[in-house]
């Protein structure tokens, strides 16, 4: 009997002189004790040992050239009889994801999987051993030598590696909310009132290409400040971020609710200092069809930044403004359990970003236009996540540290004596995380 596509009926086979040939992905699903006289597997031809533990005996001859024996039980067997010929060039025994998790906590399970197919001497007749991905562990891949010795390893679980990107998203979005004085408040030099009320919105996209993560976000901020001296302005703001992320094997949402206090000094010589402290409560939720399963958690973020710059006036209303900024941010650790019962711990995340840049602008009748460029470097940026369930455990590490460039163009427009509008677009180049686009728009009213 030959079969190059489709299935042989499930169940017990007691046919005298039975010759079974499976090729090109054809599958025989066996659910009870069976035998064949001759078994030939080629090009993905598969014997699927389904159901409860049982045995398939090969009585005369087994030939395999890229054949597969798949099993959902370590107690199911394919046994090549004493007098049978064995011509195995390549034979893969494939186990389930649950077996991968079992191997993660006890490596000897891999040998048991290899021994699902044995020859007359009791040695494994397989040349390769693989599994699907588990809930915690990645897929196992091993090879069996001529003496029946097995060597192999577990890969990282690709779905869980993407889930570990939640920490990446947390740091990405928190770092993305860092902003200099001009992004937040526009051109304060044109604001002459004692008090200021302002609001702004940013929308953008951030990518972490190592995991195929994309996060699109909307950031809203509402603030109020007061002039406490000729040079200093003191204020506060509330903010809300709403983000939607996608990654291989899943998607998610991230929401931040926070507040900030700030102080800004604008001196007569063109120099300025801007200091801001921020807090946010962060909620993350994701859905995925594999790996550790769906999950959600919340944590807190803190940040403190200080910026210094000075504007130098040139001819024909042109000016240049060198800037330097240092921002420290932290996202607290988090613990949660997924829908599949996997325990997850995310370490606290630290970011220390230094920025050196400049803005080159021109005063126009309605306000100012400018271009800007900065180089930023995160001296920290490590993201670490740990997962475990029933003794199987793994960890995932990502490094968002290093440098990148930021480029932007924008304008500040005086809509009236008391009202100012500001708009800015930017993108980044290089770095572990990229921002293909972001725009920022705000309006400030002084009184």
Give the residues covered by each predicted segment:
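Membrane translocator/pore-forming domains, dominated by Gram-negative outer-membrane beta-barrels
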Residues: 10-14, 202-447
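Acidic surface patches and DE-rich sequence motifs
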Residues: 3, 41-42, 119, 131, ...
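Short, intrinsically disordered, low-complexity segments enriched in Ser/Thr and Pro
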Residues: 60-61, 108-124, 219-240
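C-terminal amphipathic "assembly/sorting" segment characterized by alternating charged
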Residues: 19, 28-40, 169, 174, ...
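Extracellular beta-strand/loop-rich repeat segments of large surface/secreted proteins
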Residues: 1-115
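Generic recognition of flexible, low-complexity loop/linker segments
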Residues: 36, 80, 185-188, 359, ...
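Short amphipathic alpha-helix initiation/capping segments at coil-to-helix junctions
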Residues: 76, 102, 106, 118, ...
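Interface/linker segment at the passenger-translocator junction
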Residues: 92-212
């Amino acid at each position: 009997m030959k079969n190059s596509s489709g299935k042989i009926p499930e169940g017990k086979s007691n046919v005298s002189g039975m010759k079974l040939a499976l090729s090109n992905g054809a599958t025989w699903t066996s659910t009870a004790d069976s035998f064949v006289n001759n078994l030939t597997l080629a090009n993905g031809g598969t014997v699927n040992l389904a159901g409860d533990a049982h045995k398939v005996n090969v009585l005369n001859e087994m030939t395999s050239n890229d054949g597969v024996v798949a099993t959902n039980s370590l107690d199911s067997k394919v046994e090549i009889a004493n007098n049978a010929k064995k011509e195995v060039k390549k034979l893969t025994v494939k186990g389930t994801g649950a077996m991968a998790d079992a191997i993660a906590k006890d490596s000897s399970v891999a040998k048991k999987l290899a021994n699902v197919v044995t020859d007359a001497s009791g040695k494994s007749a397989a040349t390769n051993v693989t599994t699907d991905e588990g809930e915690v562990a990645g897929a196992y891949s091993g090879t069996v030598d001529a003496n029946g010795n097995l060597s192999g390893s577990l890969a990282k679980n690709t779905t869980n590696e993407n889930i570990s990107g939640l920490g990446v998203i947390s740091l990405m979005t928190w770092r993305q909310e860092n902003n200099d004085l001009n992004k937040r408040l526009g051109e304060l030099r044109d604001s002459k009132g004692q008090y200021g009320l302002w609001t702004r919105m940013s929308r953008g996209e951030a990518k972490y290409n190592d995991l195929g993560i994309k996060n699109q976000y909307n950031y809203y901020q509402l603030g109020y400040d007061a002039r406490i001296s000729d040079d200093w302005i003191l204020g506060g703001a509330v903010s809300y971020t709403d983000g939607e992320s996608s990654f291989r094997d899943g998607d998610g949402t991230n929401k931040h609710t926070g507040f900030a206090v700030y102080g800004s000094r604008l001196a007569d010589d063109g120099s300025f200092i801007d200091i801001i402290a921020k807090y946010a409560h962060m909620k993350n939720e994701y859905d995925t069809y594999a790996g550790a399963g769906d999950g959600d958690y919340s944590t807190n973020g803190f940040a403190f930044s200080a910026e210094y710059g000075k504007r130098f006036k040139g001819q024909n209303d042109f000016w240049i403004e060198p800037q330097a900024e240092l921002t420290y941010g932290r996202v607290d650790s988090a613990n949660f359990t997924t829908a599949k019962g996997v325990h997850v711990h995310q370490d606290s995340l630290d970011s220390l970003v230094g920025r050196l840049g400049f803005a080159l602008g021109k005063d126009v009748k309605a306000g100012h236009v400018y271009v800007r460029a900065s180089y930023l470097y995160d001296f920290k940026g490590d993201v670490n996540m740990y997962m475990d369930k029933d003794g199987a455990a793994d960890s995932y590490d990502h490094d968002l540290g290093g440098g990148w460039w930021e480029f932007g163009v924008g304008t500040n427009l005086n809509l009236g004596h008391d009202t100012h509008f500001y708009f800015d677009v930017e993108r980044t180049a290089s770095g572990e995380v990229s921002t293909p686009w972001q725009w920022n728009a705000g309006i400030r009213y002084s009184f």
